[in-house]
Amino acid sequence: MALWGGRFQGETSALFKLFNDSLPVDYRLFEQDVVGSIAWADAIASVGIITATECSDLKQALNELLVEVQGDPAIILASGAEDIHSFVESALIAKVGDLGKKLHTGRSRNDQVATDLKLWCQSEGKALLARLQGLHAELLALAEREFDAVMPGYTHLQRAQPVTFGHWCLAYVEMTERDISRLADALTRANTCPLGSGALAGTAYKMDRHALATALNFASPTLNSLDSVSDRDHVVELCSTASISMMHLSRMAEDLIFFNSGEANFISLSDEVTSGSSLMPQKKNPDALELIRGKTGRVYGSLVGILTTMKALPLAYNKDMQEDKEGLFDVVDSWAICLDMAVLVLSGLKVNRPNALLAAQQGYANSTELADYLVSKGMPFREAHHVVGEVVVAAIAKQIPLEDFSLAELKTFAAIIEEDVYPNLTIEACLAKRDVLGGTALPQIQQAIAAKKAR
């Protein structure tokens, strides 16, 4: 039975019903709808709309329904109800008769769905926080295990300066920490209860909305009924936070795809997260990482979708807002599986230390060290930069690394170069000189890991 039939004399078009019904999407709010309805039963009992006995009967029936649906979730979609609110109310009336018709007194589907959705976001958000913390822990463990594995660092996808794999891991630890903070902030802002706002002007019954918020584990009630029923900032923020986190996951995936490639071969991925080719027997494809990278686009799409849906809506509720859930649910599902998959990828990752070290020793990644050496001898950096560029051109022509030039050859570029230049050109020296907060020197990496583990 529709919740709004009295105003209408004609039959609803079957096509319109298919177009209008949201149960195939919002069935996921079932538990939140029941929990909110239990709290609402207490609220209307507190102002005398129902008796204590009626309240107890309603709550018992709602809890029975909760158990029944948990045992057979297919009941919901088989009902043919318009939405999850209609399903719960119809099932309640089937259990307790006309008493079930009293539950919606003073309540609108507008504040009801806003409450359901915030409850769902709080629950799923906390689960996502746990997943982010799991990723953080896995990255930190990998950083500790491979803190001294030397590899090339890149700019413009060209070898730039040597770093360590531990330093690379710590970069994503920092990103993940920001994601954790961002999600926690979003959940704090969303921790307000819209229930009691009615359709748009507030409920007509003078109930204690602070008590109602407390009953539903919200920090406080919302303060403006118009805003309460039309606010979807929590959906936007959750999608935005997911998009930023997915961007970080996608960048990490791209790095690892390259590191795993035959052209780099710095790492190997476990068989658990790779697949083969139907034609080429030798292939071992990084499909888990590619799917993380690919799913990032659909998460972005949902963020743009909800922003576009909301951008021109007048206050208060509009049916457009029914479109808030499908994208949100997909965002949360995609983000969750990508976080789980990232942990699985990292847990089985092996670093090919010889190949990574060899790559770091090539590509003239020690050029900056030669420039710094010239600066230490009194040459202005800009001049030193130019001189070293000339040395690199000559080295490329001879197909040798910088350290293979004889001292006499180096002096043709700068007479101030002495024998003590050679220790400065080693990989070890390149790393050791970056002994500053945030740098790639091994002591800095160890200190950073220890500091993060101590939190």
UniProtKB/Swiss-Prot annotation:
Enzyme class: lyase
Stretches of the chain forming a coiled coil according to its record: none
EC number: 4.3.2.1
Any GO BP annotation: arginine biosynthetic process via ornithine
UniProt-listed InterPro entries: Arg_succ_lyase_C, Argininosuccinate_lyase, Fumarase/histidase_N, Fumarate_lyase_CS, Fumarate_lyase_fam, Fumarate_lyase_N, L-Aspartase-like
GO molecular function: argininosuccinate lyase activity
Cellular compartments annotated: Cytoplasm
Keywords: Amino-acid biosynthesis, Arginine biosynthesis, Cytoplasm, Lyase
Catalytic activity entry: 2-(N(omega)-L-arginino)succinate = fumarate + L-arginine
Pfam families: ASL_C2, Lyase_1
Pathway(s) where this gene product acts: Amino-acid biosynthesis; L-arginine biosynthesis; L-arginine from L-ornithine and carbamoyl phosphate: step 3/3
Gene Ontology CC: cytosol
Family annotation (PROSITE patterns): FUMARATE_LYASES
HAMAP family per the UniProt record, alphabetical: Arg_succ_lyase
Family: Belongs to the lyase 1 family. Argininosuccinate lyase subfamily.
Name of protein: Argininosuccinate lyase
Lineage: Bacteria, Pseudomonadati, Pseudomonadota, Gammaproteobacteria, Alteromonadales
Name of the coding gene: argH
